[in-house]
Amino acid sequence: TEGSAWQNSFAVPHDIEGLAELYGGREQLMRKIDELFAEKPHYEVGGYGREIHEMTEMAAADFGQCAISNQPSFHIPYIYSALGEVDRTAYWVEKLCKEAFSYADDGFPGDEDNGTMALWYVFGVLGFYPFCPGKPEFVKGRKQVKRAFLCGREIDADSFDGNIIPYSALV
């Protein structure tokens, strides 16, 4: 689909520990993600026969192979946190929010796709993310706003210990 082998190699949010085992352990998996961010943006047009906008956007954003302009990469910066390294997630999410998004007319790094791009940004600045679909929890990042309210209640992702926030604690 719209992801490459780079992005799809990490598409296992339901078994991140198993993925880490396949890479030889947590540290090796995190090193591979470091490599993903450091790698020059490159791609093959393959069956498309031409460069499509997702390819152009990934190269323009210049976050290596993390094509934050497209859904297959949305969870990638949060893998660090899922493995217990919240600060590494916070670094990349803050950098992406500040450098890839803006309030300009073209302020999203990719197409909006029914709100997914905006919601990724909102989760990023709130400091948590629904890492695994269907699992009632969020992984932590670091909040980038002074105060936030959800359903009339103030929420503060930074006030939770550890790297996981139960869904019930926020909603």
Predicted segments with their positions:
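C-terminal beta-strand-rich structural cap/linker in extracellular carbohydrate-active enzymes
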Residues: 158-171
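Active-site core of glycosidic bond-cleaving carbohydrate-active enzymes
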Residues: 1-149, 153-154
